[in-house]
């Protein structure tokens, strides 16, 4: 029994610590959301999947600039405090966040373009 518990504990992901990530927040089509920062592209949600916890609590992201590329869908610049799974590059929880001016992302030369 203790072997089973040890193996299941080893297979369980270790929860990450909250971290602030800033970059391009993309919503190209309904239900699809990514945040691209200097380190990676982080998946927040994909069409047909359950939204990541905290997603519904985010404020309107189009208040500080939003580039529409597909109807009301598009991208903007945002800072989010999140927990992540570094292996899968998925956001596991959104703690807080909000839009920031587009110029912040545009000025960051180490940030890939959306």
Annotate the PLM regions:
Residues 12-69:
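N-terminal secretory signal peptides
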Residues 4, 14, 94-95:
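Weak global preference for isoleucine
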Residues 55-114:
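Beta-strand-rich cores of mature extracytoplasmic or soluble domains
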Residues 1-8:
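Bacterial N-terminal signal peptides
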């Amino acid at each position: 029994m203790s072997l089973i518990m040890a193996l299941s504990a080893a297979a369980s992901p270790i929860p990450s610590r909250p971290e602030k990530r800033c970059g391009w927040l993309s919503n190209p089509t309904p239900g699809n959301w990514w945040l691209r920062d200097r380190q990676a592209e982080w998946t927040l949600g994909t069409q047909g999947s359950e939204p990541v916890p905290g997603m519904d609590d985010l404020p309107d992201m189009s208040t500080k600039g939003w580039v529409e590329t597909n109807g009301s869908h598009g991208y903007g610049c945002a800072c989010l405090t999140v927990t992540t799974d570094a292996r899968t590059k998925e956001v596991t929880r959104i703690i807080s966040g909000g839009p920031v001016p587009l110029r912040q992302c545009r000025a960051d030369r180490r940030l890939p373009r959306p």
